[in-house]
């Protein structure tokens, strides 16, 4: 029998997600707007809230948008329905005549105008990319319970994921480390790349039997990074180039994850070091687990999402509609 693609005990519940969101859109937004003050009023003072809002939304000057889309028309934007659902979860609390720009999908370039996105390059000049917590059904998944400690796990690196012809960085890693004695890696998709790299899938629980889990960026960020950092294994990756709501740009090398060079040449040396220095490895796990905790408070996450939207409307000269 084919192995399930993922351990469902760690996965977000897709049927419930869709049910809740379809119910939301059946209720007129004016109902939610009446509840806004009760839900969000006078909570901006909570520690760390404004810092995160300003990280996601770096707009400092007032900007006039060219050809923006009204909130009431967002459902007409082509793209995945989950992006609309994740946006509507908080945009429903605003006047639906407010306008903005929205790019759904894996975004790796900074737009010319302030635009809501799921991902952006890690750079000083990325203010036009305003981050929202999108596609969270897939990306924001955390380990709920783990039975093995780091010390009980295999002294190896594991990786299971898709490798496409358009991802030379992933191809390069496969070329260098497929069949390496310290690695259990392979691709799970079918294409024209080496058939030797095609391997059976591993569930999340099976991957958690290894001390080290590869978190290579794909089209934008590494989608497994969140659950790996919530586990008793350690994420191994080059310094990230893209970021999402998870604020990958704030992660510190060898504090939250094990950093390897962009050409992967030091992988064996880095793994060996942390196998021999388990106290340092355990500290990384503690740091990573602590970092993840801030995303588990749903009330705080909701408030930050609301305030990120509110700041955008203020900075695009729409305060009169708030």
Write out the residue ranges for each language-model feature.
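Secretory-pathway glycan-assembly enzymes, especially type II membrane glycosyltransferases
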Residues: 1-196, 202
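Catalytic binding pocket for nucleotide-activated donors in carbohydrate/polymer assembly enzymes
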Residues: 205-322
């Amino acid at each position: 029998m084919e192995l399930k693609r993922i351990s469902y005990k760690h996965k977000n519940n897709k049927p419930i997600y869709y049910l809740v969101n379809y119910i939301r859109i059946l209720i007129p937004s004016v109902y939610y707007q009446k509840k806004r003050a009760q839900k969000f009023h006078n909570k901006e003072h909570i520690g760390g809230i404004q810092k995160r809002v300003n990280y996601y939304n770096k707009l400092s000057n007032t900007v006039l948008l060219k050809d923006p889309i009204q909130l009431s028309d967002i459902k007409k934007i082509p793209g995945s329905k989950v992006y609309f659902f994740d946006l509507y979860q908080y945009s429903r609390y605003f006047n639906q005549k407010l306008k903005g720009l929205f790019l759904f999908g894996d975004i790796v370039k900074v737009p010319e105008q302030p635009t809501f996105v799921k991902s952006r390059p890690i750079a000083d000049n990325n203010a036009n990319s305003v981050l929202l917590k999108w596609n969270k059904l897939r990306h924001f998944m955390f380990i709920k319970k783990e039975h093995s400690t780091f010390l009980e796990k295999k002294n190896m690196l594991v990786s299971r994921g898709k490798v496409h012809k358009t991802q030379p960085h992933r191809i390069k890693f496969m070329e260098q480390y497929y069949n390496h004695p310290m690695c259990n890696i392979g691709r799970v998709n079918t294409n024209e790349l080496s058939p030797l790299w095609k391997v059976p899938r591993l569930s999340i629980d099976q991957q958690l039997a290894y001390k080290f889990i590869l978190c290579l960026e794909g089209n934008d960020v590494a989608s497994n990074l969140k659950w790996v950092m919530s586990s008793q294994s350690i994420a191994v990756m080059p310094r990230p180039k893209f970021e999402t709501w998870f604020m990958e740009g704030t992660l510190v090398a060898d504090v939250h994850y094990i950093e390897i060079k962009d050409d992967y040449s030091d992988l064996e040396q880095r793994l060996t070091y942390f196998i021999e220095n388990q106290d340092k490895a355990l500290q990384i796990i503690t740091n990573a687990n602590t970092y993840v905790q801030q995303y588990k408070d749903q009330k705080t996450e909701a408030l930050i999402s609301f305030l990120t939207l509110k700041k955008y409307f203020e900075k695009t000269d729409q305060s009169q509609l708030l």
